[in-house]
Design a protein with these regions (language model features):
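Solvent-exposed alpha-helices and their adjacent loops that cap or buttress functional pockets
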Residues: 28, 121-122
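Membrane metalloprotein/metal-transporter helix-bundle signature
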Residues: 70, 90-92, 115, 119
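Divalent metal-dependent hydrolysis catalytic cores, especially in the metallo-beta-lactamase
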Residues: 66, 81-110, 122-130
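N-terminal metal-binding scaffold of metallo-dependent hydrolase/deaminase domains
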Residues: 1-49
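Metal-centered catalytic cores of metalloenzymes
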Residues: 25-31, 55, 73-75, 109, ...
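Short amphipathic alpha-helices and their capping/turn segments at secondary-structure boundaries
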Residues: 47-53, 110-121
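Short, conserved beta-strand segments within well-ordered enzyme catalytic domains
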Residues: 36, 60-62, 72, 96-98, ...
Length: 130
């Protein structure tokens, strides 16, 4: 089972419950707990003992991403969308699409593609020029 929580919004595959329990890990602490949610996180409870193999961790941030899942950031809008979806499915909740060293025209076209997707992508947060 895969559940992804981003900025208190829950993205999920295979969930029929409004609770998830496991080892909660954040930037300065870790503890056993349970998260209750609807479309947003409603409550986080610490639990003394828990019978779960789950880990609940912050999503990964990739600051230098040339592609993923067989798709390249310089290959157009559809490739960027598929690359973005691939990374999201693996737990990367934020990424900077990184250009390759290329001609001005090719780089400019890639920047236009990124610009057209930045508001539609759930994990594309910007561009890194190489």
């Amino acid at each position: 089972m895969f559940r992804l929580y981003k900025q208190k919004t829950i993205f999920t595959e295979m969930t029929n419950s409004n609770k998830v329990s496991g080892k909660i890990i954040n930037y300065n602490d870790s503890y056993s707990g349970e998260i209750t949610f609807d479309e947003n996180i409603l409550n986080i409870n610490k639990i003394e003992e828990i019978n779960s193999e789950n880990y609940i961790i912050p999503g990964f941030v990739d600051l230098h991403c040339h592609g993923g899942g067989g798709f390249d950031t310089m290959d157009g809008v559809q490739a960027i969308q598929k690359m973005s979806s691939y990374h999201l499915s693996k737990g990367t909740t934020s990424l900077l699409a990184t250009t390759w060293t290329s001609s001005f025209e090719h780089t400019y076209a890639a920047l236009n593609d990124f610009n057209s997707l930045i508001d539609m992508s759930s994990n594309l947060i910007g561009v890194h020029l190489e």
